[in-house]
Amino acid sequence: MSYRKLGRTSSQRKALLRDLTTDLLINERIVTTEARAKEVRSTAEKMITLGKRGDLHARRQAAAYVRNEIASVEEQDDNSVVVKSALQKLFSDLAPKYADRKGGYTRILKTAPRRGDGAPMVIIELV
């Protein structure tokens, strides 16, 4: 299996990809470098495919990878607050959205290079 090292150790790279994948699932659009985006595309598509499967084993596999972060907070009419995590958003919002799609859930758009070091920057978003 080939992958990009991204100039980091194995554990740092795994943490970076977990964070970026979780941020992409929560915000549905992030700005990052081209190399990172191409790696995140792979993991994000795997997570959405797990979400589409929807069984208990898929939920546990996704929970092992996606960070436990708050995706949204909503107030109900009776003054109660509903907090939705990134994992809940994946299975309840994103999976039904892509139910009829067989892959290609992300899009990478090139933008201007980063000002400090000229690194190629992109916007990666969910289609």
UniProtKB/Swiss-Prot annotation:
Keywords assigned: Ribonucleoprotein, Ribosomal protein
Any single GO CC term annotated in Swiss-Prot or TrEMBL for this entry: cytosolic large ribosomal subunit
GO molecular function: structural constituent of ribosome
Pfam families: Ribosomal_L17 (PF01196)
Record SUPFAM superfamilies: Prokaryotic ribosomal protein L17
Domain of life: Bacteria
Biological-process GO terms, alphabetical: translation
Keyword Amino-acid biosynthesis annotated: no
Entry annotated with the keyword Chloroplast: no
InterPro entries reported in the protein's UniProt record: Ribosomal_bL17, Ribosomal_bL17_CS, Ribosomal_bL17_sf
Subunit structure: Part of the 50S ribosomal subunit. Contacts protein L32.
Matches recorded under NCBIfam families: L17
Family under the similarity heading: Belongs to the bacterial ribosomal protein bL17 family.
Protein's name according to its UniProt entry: Large ribosomal subunit protein bL17
Gene name as annotated: rplQ
